[in-house]
Amino acid sequence: MKVSAALLCLLLTAATFCTQVLAQPDAINSPVTCCYTLTSKKISMQRLMSYRRVTSSKCPKEAVIFKTIAGKEICAEPKQKWVQDSISHLDKKNQTPKP
C-alpha cells in the first residue's frame, strides 16, 4: 500500500513538471526588440549602415530598425516610401563586392 501511494505521488509530480515544461513558449529565452514609436522624419541614406525588420507577434507594431553610421538605432514605418527606398539602397549597397 505504501509503495503504491509513493508511486502515485511520484507520477503526479512528474506529470505536473511535464505539463509546465510543455506549456512554455518556444522562444522563451530569445530577446525580442520592439518599436513602440516610429520616426516620421526621413533619414538620409548616407547616414544608414544597415537595417532589420521587426515582425515578431510579441511586438505591437511591424517596423524597420535602421542602424546609422553613428551607431544609433531608429524605428521607422515599413510602408513609407522613403523606408522602402532606403531598404533597396542598403540591399544594393551590401550586394556590391568591395574591391
UniProtKB/Swiss-Prot annotation:
Record-level GO BP terms: antimicrobial humoral immune response mediated by antimicrobial peptide; astrocyte cell migration; cellular response to fibroblast growth factor stimulus; cellular response to interleukin-1; cellular response to tumor necrosis factor; cellular response to type II interferon; chemokine-mediated signaling pathway; cytoskeleton organization
Location(s), subcellular: Secreted
Coiled coil, from the record: none
Family annotation (SMART domains): SCY (SM00199)
Modified residues (Pyrrolidone carboxylic acid): 24
GO MF: CCR chemokine receptor binding; chemokine activity
S-S bonds: 34-59, 35-75
Keywords: Chemotaxis, Cytokine, Disulfide bond, Inflammatory response, Pyrrolidone carboxylic acid, Secreted, Signal
Record's signal peptide: 1-23
Listed InterPro entries: Chemokine_b/g/d, Chemokine_CC_CS, Chemokine_IL8-like_dom, Interleukin_8-like_sf
The record's account of how the chain is modified after translation: Processing at the N-terminus can regulate receptor and target cell selectivity. Deletion of the N-terminal residue converts it from an activator of basophil to an eosinophil chemoattractant. N-Glycosylated.
Entry's Gene Ontology cellular component terms: extracellular space
Keyword Secreted: yes
Family from the record: Belongs to the intercrine beta (chemokine CC) family.
Subunit structure of this chain's protein: Monomer or homodimer; in equilibrium. Is tethered on endothelial cells by glycosaminoglycan (GAG) side chains of proteoglycans. Interacts with TNFAIP6 (via Link domain).
Protein name: C-C motif chemokine 2
Species this protein is from: Sus scrofa
